Amino acid sequence: MSKIEPLPQAECQRLFQEHLYQLDPTQPVPVPSIASSLETAGVCCLRGLVTAAEVTGVRERFRDQFSRDDDRPGVGESQGDVQRNFQKLRVGISPPKPMNSRLVRTIYNPLWDEDLFGMHALFRRMIRVRNALLGAAEDFALTQPEQGLWTAARLQHYPRGGGFMSAHRDELIIDATADRGLDHFQLLLMLSQKGVDYQRGGGFTIRDERFVDTEQFCELGDMVVYDSRSVHGVDTIDPQETLDLETTSGRLVAFVTLYRDLTG
């Protein structure tokens, strides 16, 4: 197997700028341009749909309400559990694929449950973008399961001093959408900023045998879209620090992924 070399910073910056979209929230999502970026680069950034001030408000509420005592085991929950407000800490491998390992805290916060951190308005904005990319109705799977799919609105927290996710492909997402003619992409919202909230690590993709840092030029409130069929992951967050599971320090992002509804 050939060695994966990092893409030089200057090339990362060029790639980022070529696939950065400054958007107006009142205007349609530029779906063809985003699709072209995913085909060309595997990732792009959408800026202007969420403000840094909005993100700061969410982060403050998350910090104030967070308790490690709310952590549940990383496996064993039912889908009914995560279709409510639910927090879990997952550490280790994910059978049957031993190479898929992680240290990440996930906080499910569906739009039909209490808005714990003031995220619901931002989730709705994300869902609008997601549905535009899917070619679906603007409110598709917004407040309840629809056509066998539900929106797993959630935060992911990668703790300082060791949070990570190994390189993988999003096979559950692909499986959930493959027979519906939906494009294969993942959308996340940056609720933290590299160089400010964490110094090392963060999101990456592997493209053309190169390790591409996808977050070093992102800002608070940016939405990142990547091809979920690509190999991607989260490089270890601040490995030079002692692991901190007691606070919200580290990397924080949000997702509105569609999963199959198995509760009916």
Predicted regions and their residues:
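Short, P/G- and charge-enriched loop/turn segments at secondary-structure junctions
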Residues: 172-177, 242-243
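Fe(II)/2-oxoglutarate
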Residues: 1-40, 70
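Signature of the catalytic double-stranded beta-helix
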Residues: 50, 89-153, 158-159
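Short amphipathic
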Residues: 44-50
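Short, conserved beta-strand element in jelly-roll/cupin
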Residues: 155-160, 175-197, 254-258
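Histidine-centered catalytic micro-motifs
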Residues: 165-172
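Catalytic core of Fe(II)/2-oxoglutarate
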Residues: 183, 194-264
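Cytochrome P450 catalytic domain signature, combining two hallmark sequence patches
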Residues: 63-75
